[in-house]
Amino acid sequence: MALSSNWQALLASESNPTSNGKNKQSNRKIRNVKKVSKTVNVSSTTQYAPRKRKNGSKIMDMVYNMNKEISKHEKDKLEGKVFEFNPNKANTSTTIKEPVKVGISEDTRINSNKSKEIGKYIAMDCEFVGVGPEGKESALARISIVNYFGHVVLDEFVKPREKVVEWRTWVSGIKPEHMKNAITFKEAQKKTADILEGRILVGHALKHDLEALMLSHPKSLLRDTSRHLPFRKLYAKGKTPSLKKLTREVLKISIQEGEHSSVEDARATMLLYKKEKTEFEKIHRNTFN
């Protein structure tokens, strides 16, 4: 009986066990090599993988960073790069020196290094107290004049000729103690007249201040911010704008937040004039030429 080819091959393999064993061993080696290489690859990958942080290490990092920032802050403080408020050195006094200045002060005015000469342009402002029945009438109590650059030319408290009924301190800033070194009305009038002579006078509602001083000044030499038409149209619907409103709207500066200062108000009017000087002079030429 003839054997099939498959059967013959099976017999041949059984008759040669050595060869078959070698093949099996060889196959095992190949499989082992594959396993080893796989293991090596896995180990090489896990060797560089980041380890999980423990909670303790996060806290230590935070402590380290905090200490680092503290050290940097101390170093900057020693080098003067850091401002530190020291309550022991701070001036916490509630006493306010007179006169109260808000907004435009000696230190904040523009052109503070310019000439202190009187010059061609001056700005004037006055403060008043109440006299007469119920203190409803006004009497001159302070006169202040500054030059074009804001330097004080004249600043004097003035003794009213009438008995003061209402000091109006809340708005005027004038107090009874200011009268100790005050000059007389006649002295104030004379000093002011000498300064005004031949100069361009800037102010707000100048008619009122000049009448209080019993002085006159040529209209061609007046620059009144309360009567400047562009200001009236833009900020008061054609009426007379307050100095406080003009200063806030035009200069972006707040004044008269408490007791008034005639020095501050005079500086404010000069700044307003300088801001719109071209328009002021254009209207002036059209009016007087």
UniProtKB/Swiss-Prot annotation:
Renumbered to this chain, the Basic residues biased-composition regions fall at 25-34
Q: Which SMART domains match?
A: EXOIII
Q: Which residue stretches does the UniProt record annotate as biased composition, category Polar residues?
A: 1-24
Q: Does the keyword Nucleus apply?
A: yes
This entry carries the following GO cellular component terms, namely: nucleolus; nucleus
Q: Which GO terms describe its molecular function?
A: 3'-5' exonuclease activity; exonuclease activity; nucleic acid binding
Report the record's disulfide bonds: none
Domain Exonuclease per the UniProt entry, residue ranges = 121-273
Provide this UniProt record's keywords sorted from A to Z: Exonuclease, Hydrolase, Nuclease, Nucleus, rRNA processing
Compartments, as annotated in UniProt: Nucleus
Q: Ribonucleoprotein: present as a keyword of the record?
A: no
What domain of life? Eukaryota
Coiled coil spans: none
Q: Which GO terms describe its biological process?
A: ribosomal large subunit assembly; RNA processing; rRNA processing
SUPFAM superfamilies documented for this protein: Ribonuclease H-like (SSF53098)
Write down a Pfam family by its short name.
RNase_T
- Enzyme Commission code: 3.1.-.-
Region of interest called Disordered, as start-end residue ranges on this chain? 1-34
Additional detail: Present with 4280 molecules/cell in log phase SD medium.
Q: Which family is this protein grouped under?
A: Belongs to the REXO4 family.
Primary role? Exoribonuclease involved in ribosome biosynthesis. Involved in the processing of ITS1, the internal transcribed spacer localized between the 18S and 5.8S rRNAs.
Name the UniProt record assigns to this protein: RNA exonuclease 4
Q: Which organism is it from?
A: Saccharomyces cerevisiae (strain ATCC 204508 / S288c)
Traced from the root, the source organism's taxonomic lineage reads: Eukaryota, Fungi, Dikarya, Ascomycota, Saccharomycotina
Gene field? REX4
